[in-house]
């Protein structure tokens, strides 16, 4: 079970949004590389990074900040935002990104996901961000007419490493993860699922470690870590104890 600390990038800074709204961004660190180092020092094992500007632009927009992070941490980094063609995927993987996350392109160009997953086994994940059950695209600015399960099932045999499922309504609001929807998705497919959006407290970590959530690979923690509502030492100790049991 992995707890991924999140770094969302906007204008080269580390921010958190509320419900994916770029107008509701709070800057938490002017130096994303320093934030990445802080997470590494706290004992986290895997970093989750999103290029928010890239998600809206459809191409990488915070490459300098991402590359700076890669230089200062040794833990694996998964990256999403603006990754919509094979050339961009190849470029990021060659620079040291452990796993790329394809979001909008997974809805609009599923063949890209299948091609990339075949070319780079274990290094391609799909990000499914749902609003009222349907997947949103273009940095969450547009809603599609397909459900997360519809999309996920397209990639059952494609070799996708993970599905990162976000409930947009809860993202950045500290209301707790939508466990019902996330676990239902995980139980309906064979691809590992990572929970995202709304992780609020140590109680969410306990749920993550419960038998109910046994099909989940992990969860992403954002605002709760920055606000101090989730103590990283306590959370990682809980996960460590569960692994040792």
Curated annotation (Swiss-Prot):
Any GO BP: L-tryptophan biosynthetic process
InterPro entries: Aldolase_TIM, His_biosynth, HisA_bact_arch, Isoase_HisA-like, Isoase_HisA-like_bact, RibuloseP-bd_barrel
GO function terms (MF aspect): 1-(5-phosphoribosyl)-5-[(5-phosphoribosylamino)methylideneamino]imidazole-4-carboxamide isomerase activity
Matching Pfam families: His_biosynth
EC nos: 5.3.1.16
Subcellular location as annotated: Cytoplasm
Record-stated family: Belongs to the HisA/HisF family.
Name this protein carries in UniProt: 1-(5-phosphoribosyl)-5-[(5-phosphoribosylamino)methylideneamino] imidazole-4-carboxamide isomerase
